[in-house]
């Protein structure tokens, strides 16, 4: 499953590029909330493996990781005669839960899922958290727009 997110990246995951359901946190990307991270997620024997897609030092229109990853998704759709679903989750979803929801959709409906995961579970007193998440959702529009 292809994962696109503007969540903050955990330190260990950033350096190794290999992680699990804790690879991304519950806050906005600290570098830039409109900057997406791209990863591939696979659930094997009940365990998540999340692999960060590294960017080349010199990005050009010919070597964009997002383009290459989406081309892989489209090829899998063609090869396996599957449809593709771009899934954006709702409010109050930790990263692990968004992975689970995307995975269930993918397996239940035999689809290729591209998951956009945004920090919708920032914590705190419920009313204040809701207001904060509303601001985060507005801020995330640039990130989701760039993923399209």
Residue spans for each PLM region:
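Flexible, membrane-associating and regulatory peripheral segments of lipid-active enzymes
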Residues: 1-114, 123-128, 132-135, 139, ...
């Amino acid at each position: 499953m292809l994962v696109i997110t503007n969540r903050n990246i955990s330190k260990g995951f950033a350096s190794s590029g290999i992680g699990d359901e804790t690879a991304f946190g519950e806050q906005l990307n600290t570098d830039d909330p409109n900057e997406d991270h791209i990863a591939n997620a696979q659930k094997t024997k009940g365990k998540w493996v999340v692999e960060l897609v590294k960017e080349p030092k010199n990005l050009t229109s010919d070597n964009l990781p997002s383009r290459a990853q989406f081309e892989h998704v489209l090829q899998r759709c063609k090869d396996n005669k599957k449809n593709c679903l771009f899934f954006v989750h709702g409010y109050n979803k930790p990263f692990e839960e968004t992975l689970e929801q995307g995975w269930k959709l993918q397996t239940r409906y035999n689809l290729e899922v591209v998951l956009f995961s945004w920090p919708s579970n920032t914590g705190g007193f419920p009313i204040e958290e809701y207001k904060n998440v509303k601001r985060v959702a507005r801020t995330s529009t640039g990130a989701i727009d760039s993923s399209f």
